[in-house]
């Protein structure tokens, strides 16, 4: 059985990136809550 986590920067950004979060209402809610908690990183996009 192969391991389930096969890292890919592109897939990670497309799924969890800033634009992906902004695209849906629930994603915007995620950003809002992360801003409220003053997270250093809002999304994985800021890893670059």
Curated annotation (Swiss-Prot):
Gene3D superfamilies: 1.10.287.3980. It comes from the Bacteria. Keywords: Ribonucleoprotein, Ribosomal protein. It holds the Pfam family Ribosomal_L34. PROSITE patterns: RIBOSOMAL_L34. One of its GO terms (biological process) is translation. InterPro entries: Ribosomal_bL34 (IPR000271), Ribosomal_bL34_CS (IPR020939). One of its GO terms (molecular function) is structural constituent of ribosome. GO terms for cellular component: ribonucleoprotein complex; ribosome. HAMAP family: Ribosomal_bL34 (MF_00391). Belongs to the bacterial ribosomal protein bL34 family. This is Large ribosomal subunit protein bL34. It comes from Mycoplasma pneumoniae (strain ATCC 29342 / M129 / Subtype 1) (Mycoplasmoides pneumoniae). The lineage of its organism: Bacteria, Bacillati, Mycoplasmatota, Mycoplasmoidales, Mycoplasmoidaceae.
